[in-house]
Design a protein with these regions (language model features):
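Nucleotide-binding motor/catalytic cores of P-loop/tubulin-like NTPases across gene-expression machines
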Residues: 315-316
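Conserved PLP-enzyme active-site core in the AAT-like
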Residues: 2-288, 292-310, 319-330
Length: 330
């Protein structure tokens, strides 16, 4: 079986497992108050060029998303996201479950090539019209959510990130960036956004571990102290505090040593691009132009049968027409 349906079908980077084993009998404080979490937090802050970065370790991406959004949104507010944003399509209503609507905006006919990305001009138009109307019967936008890379493996540019941040500031909204697969964006040759940029042009972002070589875990980073009030309590309230917190610290301490977070993801991006080129050379088209570890070719049912017969697994992303599906290779 050749598994291409996700990027978390194996355990973790072998060195992390070795450190787990080596430190297994150590006794440390719980709840992320251990030396490993402290060291990892300091290394992440240095990598982001921001000494006062407030780092919190959670277990999973959906948990991180609804906990962060629950902490920054008021009861009458929702979060603006792309149509294919993870919080809108792949979290079983987790954000709605804590009382906040996902306000999904469409790129429409103008930029319909990819509904996983928010374009600055479309965001600005949506927010400007909403607040100009002043309709207090409607759910009010209280934050903007984006991911880098997006659900379709598409990258934001630094220019787009700066523009989105500027729009958020103009409307007095926090910008939250989901980095579930951030390492693959940072490892891509087509990426021009750095960790320092994320620390400068977002209010909150998280650094993915689960899908980026770790066994589990995400590092939520507050760059703006306006939004981290009582976050430890809110995380506990939402069931997000791991008693054996050092298991999170150990992983991120390793990932942020010797640039491992980026370097360990380069092969995944390299081979994904090789697969992309091989399929393109055979006349296969893609639903988006991805330069990360996720690729989205459009295959006929006959072509999918060939993959099935050769024990190659994949995810069906969407139906394109009566003869073709878009699949995800990851």
């Amino acid at each position: 079986m050749y598994r291409f349906e996700n990027d978390y079908s194996q355990g973790c980077i072998p060195e992390i497992l070795e450190i787990f084993t080596r430190t297994n009998m150590e006794q440390t404080s719980g709840y992320r108050l251990d030396p490993y979490c402290k060291a990892a937090s300091e290394k992440i802050a240095r990598a982001c060029g921001k000494d006062d970065l407030d780092v919190h370790f959670l277990v999973g991406g959906t948990q991180a998303n609804f906990t962060v959004l629950d902490s920054i949104l008021r009861p009458h507010q929702g979060v603006v996201a792309a149509q294919l944003g993870h919080v809108n399509v792949h979290e079983a209503g987790a954000v709605e479950g804590v009382g906040h609507k996902v306000l999904a905006i469409s790129n429409g006919d103008i930029k319909k090539d990819d509904e996983s990305k928010i374009y600055p001009d479309i965001l600005d138009d949506y927010l400007t019209k909403f607040f100009a109307k002043g309709d207090w019967h409607m759910v009010q936008p209280g934050a903007v959510y984006i991911s880098h890379p997006t659900e379709r493996g598409v990258l934001y540019t630094r220019e787009e990130l700066i523009a989105i941040k500027s729009i958020c500031e103009r409307h007095n909204l926090p910008l939250y960036l989901d980095g579930a697969r951030l390492s693959y964006a940072l490892a891509s040759e087509n990426n021009d956004i750095s960790l320092e940029d994320l620390a400068k042009y977002t209010d909150i972002f998280y650094i993915g571990g689960t899908k980026c070589g770790g066994m589990f875990g995400e590092a939520v980073c507050f760059t703006n102290s306006k939004y981290n009030l009582d976050f430890n309590c809110i995380t506990k309230h939402n069931g997000g505090v791991l008693a054996k917190g050092r298991l999170l610290g150990i992983q991120f301490d390793y990932l942020f040593t010797d640039n491992n977070y980026i370097e360990k993801s380069r092969n995944a991006v390299k081979y994904a691009i090789m697969i992309k080129k091989a399929l393109e050379d055979r006349g296969i088209s893609f639903i988006v132009d991805s330069y990360t570890n996720q690729q989205f070719p459009i295959l006929s049912y006959f072509q999918k049968e060939i993959l099935d017969k050769n024990n190659i697994t994949y995810n069906v992303e969407s139906n394109v027409d009566e003869n073709n599906d878009c699949i995800r290779l990851c």
